[in-house]
Amino acid sequence: MSNSDNPKNGADFQKKVRVWFEKKYNLKFELEKKIAIGNPPKDHKFDIVCESKKIAIECKRYTWTETGNVPSAKMGAANEAAFYLSFLSEEYDKYIVMLRTYTQKRDESLAEYYYRTYKHLIGDIHVLEYDPDNDVMQEIKGDINTEGVC
């Protein structure tokens, strides 16, 4: 797979995550939804947003490098997603959903590594990992309880 496949693979992953959340919450979610953040407010496009604007999700379809090392630049992009999510009000449930990808070299998934390394930056953001082949979402940090979310 070449880097030119990344945008399509990322978009496919995003759509699968949206479908999973729609089934989980029995609600409609929008892709690439703009929400005003900051002061003065400026629109930012979040990957997936609940129609009632109570859930915002950023999707990260990252993998370990071929040699099992950390994709450092991609972790910076995940931190940027956390930064934007942090500007949303407390009424939002905020999620970073990462592709389930595991390496024996470190005996952990990339989402587990991300949370372990950057939890001081994550705050009230839920970190989940999704296995699209088996349609399984796993919580790394947070609670994906459906009561009163949206």
What are these regions (language model features)?
Residues 42-44, 80:
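Alpha-helical scaffolding within the catalytic cores
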Residues 44-60:
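Active-site beta-strand-loop-beta-strand hairpin of nuclease catalytic cores
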Residues 36-41, 103-106:
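Acidic-and-aromatic substrate-binding clefts and catalytic sites of carbohydrate-active enzymes
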Residues 95-150:
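Domain-level recognition of nuclease-like catalytic cores that cleave nucleotide substrates
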Residues 60-117:
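Catalytic cores of nucleic-acid endonucleases
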Residues 1-36:
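Acidic-basic catalytic patches of nuclease active cores, encompassing PD-(D/E)XK
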Residues 26-28, 91, 124:
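A generic structural signal for alpha->beta connector loops
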Residues 18-29, 43, 69-70, 112-118:
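Catalytic phosphate/metal-binding cores of nucleic-acid and nucleotide-processing enzymes, i.e., regions
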